[in-house]
Amino acid sequence: MTTMQLDSDGRLRHLLTLEGVPRTTLLQLLDRAGQIRDAAVGRVGKRSVLAGTAVCTLFFEPSTRTRSSFHLAAQRLGADVLNFDASTSSTRKGETARDTLKNLEAMGVRGFVVRHPDDGAVKALAAAAGEGTALINAGDGRSAHPTQGLLDMLTLRQAKGTDFSKLKVVIVGDVKHSRVARSDLHALRTLGAGEIRVCGPASLLPDDGILEGCVVGQDFDAMLEGADALMMLRLQRERMEEGLVPSLEQYHTEYGLTRERLARAGHDAAVLHPGPINRGVEITDEVADGAQSCVLRQVANGVAVRMAVLETLLG
């Protein structure tokens, strides 16, 4: 079935969301990322899969990890990489994102990695793109961040094995506003995770059906019991300004991951965080830097995953 991101043969033509991506496609991407992760962290030389292909990182929001990761991934595949900076571009003169895309297409750019503050913005750009152009959603609004979801799944596979059927995964924090949480939820369901628990203040839990089938609660200590993996979400400080969280201190008291709390989970529970970490809010230093932390592994895996996605779409 042809969709916005799948062609009539079920092959990816864009990566906009993990929702609706077939299990076989997810597994192929994860397997490929696993195969090339040594190259992704610099231990193998540059490849030429995308030699002569122009890729643009089209970011309308600030980013460090994601943008750098995509840049390295495209570079290591041999692509010509163009970094678009909205703060110095014609968008400041009123040019639309669509016109920016079409002008860059006219220059021969074939791949676009897009981050945008608005929900659905990347999907709208994909609809405007010409034949043979591929778009990758690097995060739009609160909708989706598919490559973050993929790198989280790769990290879980490395820490816990490829069979997710018995995994108990806890997602903690501001799920309501998190595009990472939505992508993780879609991926975990598709890969058959045994139990998905979602925990956070009532004001930060969504009510739009995304949590269907999850175990939902506000008691973090209870949710930790026997957990195999913890996905800690960044608390945006504007949530406190909006009155959704009384204070950072109270949030940490109720939902911060400390060494003592971590002991309630499985003895080898993996700790993930998409970054940037608010140390002392979501996670203490000793947990973030401890033996069970997978945070830097996530960062390294991000390059491998993005190489696999770029290779699949443009190779």
UniProtKB/Swiss-Prot annotation:
Gene Ontology process terms (BP): 'de novo' pyrimidine nucleobase biosynthetic process; 'de novo' UMP biosynthetic process; amino acid metabolic process
Binding site for L-aspartate: K93, R179, R234
GO CC terms: cytosol
Family to which the UniProt record says this protein belongs: Belongs to the aspartate/ornithine carbamoyltransferase superfamily. ATCase family.
Domain of life, source organism: Bacteria
Annotated protein name in UniProt: Aspartate carbamoyltransferase catalytic subunit
Pfam families the record matches: OTCace, OTCace_N
Quaternary structure, from the entry: Heterododecamer (2C3:3R2) of six catalytic PyrB chains organized as two trimers (C3), and six regulatory PyrI chains organized as three dimers (R2).
InterPro entries per UniProt: Asp/Orn_carbamoyltranf_P-bd, Asp/Orn_carbamoylTrfase, Asp/Orn_carbamoylTrfase_sf, Asp_carbamoyltransf, Asp_carbamoyltransf_Asp/Orn-bd
Protein task: Catalyzes the condensation of carbamoyl phosphate and aspartate to form carbamoyl aspartate and inorganic phosphate, the committed step in the de novo pyrimidine nucleotide biosynthesis pathway.
Keyword annotations of the record: Pyrimidine biosynthesis, Transferase
Entry's EC annotation: 2.1.3.2
MF (Gene Ontology): amino acid binding; aspartate carbamoyltransferase activity
NCBIfam families reported for this sequence: asp_carb_tr, PRK00856.1
EC primary class: transferase
Pathway membership, UniProt: Pyrimidine metabolism; UMP biosynthesis via de novo pathway; (S)-dihydroorotate from bicarbonate: step 2/3
Classification via SUPFAM superfamilies: Aspartate/ornithine carbamoyltransferase (SSF53671)
Binding site for carbamoyl phosphate: R65, T66, R115, H145, Q148, G275, P276
Natural source organism: Xanthomonas oryzae pv. oryzae (strain KACC10331 / KXO85)
Catalytic reaction(s) noted: carbamoyl phosphate + L-aspartate = N-carbamoyl-L-aspartate + phosphate + H(+)
